Amino acid sequence: MAEAALEAVRSELREFPAAARELCVPLAVPYLDKPPTPLHFYRDWVCPNRPCIIRNALQHWPALQKWSLPYFRATVGSTEVSVAVTPDGYADAVRGDRFMMPAERRLPLSFVLDVLEGRAQHPGVLYVQKQCSNLPSELPQLLPDLESHVPWASEALGKMPDAVNFWLGEAAAVTSLHKDHYENLYCVVSGEKHFLFHPPSDRPFIPYELYTPATYQLTEEGTFKVVDEEAMEKVPWIPLDPLAPDLARYPSYSQAQALRCTVRAGEMLYLPALWFHHVQQSQGCIAVNFWYDMEYDLKYSYFQLLDSLTKASGLD
């Protein structure tokens, strides 16, 4: 009887993503031709937890005309920034039986630009991706070129962003599939970002496993050493590559339906909290994003319930 009840729960979980998709998940990421009003943004996008791409949202930013690799070289080239370095472009990702975190180096931005332009070489793949508001903390000289927040979003959400992050890296740098507890406004200033999404309702089809955390260490010879972080707890992470999923190992993922979009220069993506996302980029893509903490309300509680049931039922 207990097994029958458990199978009934599994059946409901398998059917839930399709039901949610029919009710509230778009078939493609919609476009807006201009920034929404605070009311429109909150009512039509934040409340229903739906992504959108907003055109003409950055037109008033000087950065849109000024930011380029030559401009960075002239204005902040001598500034040292934190750079994630990995052998294959995957930072904070599952590699083998480890959750691998990048080696972190402090490098002059001019050297990063040299690598991006093919003037210099460095072992591995470089990505300026340190979060925790690396734009104001590491590159404050660039702040006059953009707004410190997104006014209509700040008004709609009733708060200021927790972090303003700067992103610059090689085309080989990839962000593995994951979710965040932030309302994310992702602004591409130059180049393109390629996103793959899953709504939170796809959680029953998205596997998680526990991994020993480890960090890449760059040796003097230019090779990478894996160092286990023995003092840290195991990390739950998604082992699956959505671009080449191992369906023999994770057959349930075949029932998930991803959305894909490309965010181009001058466009802003609203990525709702709890949406799973995987990110690629063009070479030397320049982007800034604003993280607004989500409301930990009933919507969050329902997702936690879905997550817990997925784990308890053995679908994970």
Swiss-Prot record:
Q: Which amino acid positions bind Fe cation, per UniProt?
A: H178, D180, H277
Q: Which residue numbers delimit the JmjC domain?
A: 128-307
Gene Ontology CC annotations of this record: cytoplasm; cytosol; nucleus
Per its record, the protein catalyses:
L-lysyl-[protein] + 2-oxoglutarate + O2 = (3S)-3-hydroxy-L-lysyl-[protein] + succinate + CO2
Secreted in keyword set: no
Localization, UniProt: Nucleus; Cytoplasm
Entry annotated with the keyword Endoplasmic reticulum? no
Which molecular function terms from Gene Ontology are attached? 2-oxoglutarate-dependent dioxygenase activity; aminopeptidase activity; endopeptidase activity; metal ion binding; monooxygenase activity; peptidyl-lysine 3-dioxygenase activity
Which residues belong to the signal peptide in this entry?
none
Question: EC no.?
Answer: 1.14.11.63, 3.4.-.-
Top-level taxon of origin: Eukaryota
Q: InterPro entries in the record, alphabetically? A: Cupin_8, JmjC_dom, RmlC-like_jellyroll
Which keywords does UniProt give here? Aminopeptidase, Cytoplasm, Disulfide bond, Hydrolase, Iron, Metal-binding, Monooxygenase, Nucleus, Oxidoreductase, Protease
**BP terms from Gene Ontology:** protein hydroxylation; proteolysis
Cofactors named for this entry: Fe(2+)
Role summary = Bifunctional enzyme that acts both as an endopeptidase and 2-oxoglutarate-dependent monooxygenase. Endopeptidase that cleaves histones N-terminal tails at the carboxyl side of methylated arginine or lysine residues, to generate 'tailless nucleosomes', which may trigger transcription elongation. Preferentially recognizes and cleaves monomethylated and dimethylated arginine residues of histones H2, H3 and H4. After initial cleavage, continues to digest histones tails via its aminopeptidase activity. Additionally, may play a role in protein biosynthesis by modifying the translation machinery.
**SUBUNIT field:** Homodimer; disulfide-linked. Interacts with DRG1 and DRG2.
Name of the protein: Bifunctional peptidase and (3S)-lysyl hydroxylase JMJD7
What is the originating organism of this protein?
Answer: Homo sapiens
Upper lineage is: Eukaryota, Metazoa, Chordata, Craniata, Vertebrata
